[in-house]
Amino acid sequence: MNELTSPSSIDVEKVEASRFQMDRVMTIISAHFIHDTYSAFLAPLLPNLIEKLSLSYTQAGSLSAITQLPSLLNPIIGYLDDKVNLRIFVILAPAISATTMSCLGFAPNYLTLVILLFITGMSIAAFHAPSPAMIARASGSRVGRGMSLYMAAGELGRTIGPLLASWGLLTFTLGRMFPIAIPGWFASLAIFIRFKGIPVHVEKQTGFREVLPTARRLFFPLIGIIFFRSFLITGLGVYLPTLLEGEGASIWKAGTTLAIYQFAGVVGAILGGTISDRLGRKPVLLAVSILAPIMVFGFLLTSGWLTIPVLILAGLFGLSSQPIMLAIVQDHLPTHRSIGNGFFMAINFICLSVAAIGIGILGDRLGLRQAFLWTALSGLLVSPLVLLIPRTPNRISKM
């Protein structure tokens, strides 16, 4: 009887593996949205922290870099997730990030800020290493769509985050924003309850040495793409409120402008991966890599109301490449999804850290607007590297 039923059970497993499991995807992307809402507090609070603690732009940039530092652990976290499943990190991360980011105003000095942001960085790393692999497994044959929804949820969180932080700043003041953390605690509780109904998945692996040549060919161009793209998106994503407030904008206007940019990224994230499922990863990634720096140049050259539509296009194209690259990694490393994503996230966060500090140094020496010009120039170097990405395997294993 076992021999007779075995083929049908295998067929059921294949169908299940190829199916887009919306309920599981929604659970994970909800966690991503809530987590990234709180992790997006730094940029809108940065002008006030600079004023309160008399920070230089270089010190301000280092704060963003501190949150990225724990990303060095991402490959290890990804490796462990492939072995034993670490979804508890996905459950706890919203509560941890909500607590630390709502307490930034309590910091009496630069060192305390560093400690709080390092804890936030640990939460970010622990969340972002396993969660994309969870999305890929739940997305079946439509990994691009799953990654688009995942990234869109994060971008939506980074859209709401500046607005929530600006509201909290005006309502409670910088040193009394702690009540804003409460929804994050309830979110972790709700995610825990929802995850109880989802079975634990541990990846069935081949040896990592077998896929190492593929990983090398893939990550060689990706490292360059991530590095130069990091400067392009960090300028607007981290320093836009500081630039605008330095030029006379109000707290609310600066926060709203950042939210507009991030919301455009939500749309870009949804479209990027989904379109790449149909047209191919490389063509879509190449197109957005060409258009994104052009839009940043446009933002710097326009003034008044014209900056808004240009900023929307900058967010649309600049933030749409992440789900495409995540899908590329998942396509090439189907038997090592978490560790592949861990390496990708580690490289991404390290490059974002370098970019944040680099732009801060340029801002101190040349001014932020001139620093933004250099970020746009760096973005022009991305598109040639896209051409070096190896072709996606014709047959992708569905895990």
Predicted features along the sequence, with ranges:
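Central cavity-lining transmembrane alpha-helices of secondary-active solute carriers
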Residues: 65-78, 259-271
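Cytoplasmic helix-loop-helix junction between adjacent transmembrane helices
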Residues: 116-153
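Helix-loop-helix hairpin linking two adjacent transmembrane segments in secondary transporters
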Residues: 141, 150-196
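C-terminal transmembrane helical hairpin of 12-TM major facilitator-type secondary transporters
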Residues: 276-325
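A late C-terminal transmembrane helix in Major Facilitator Superfamily
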Residues: 334-365
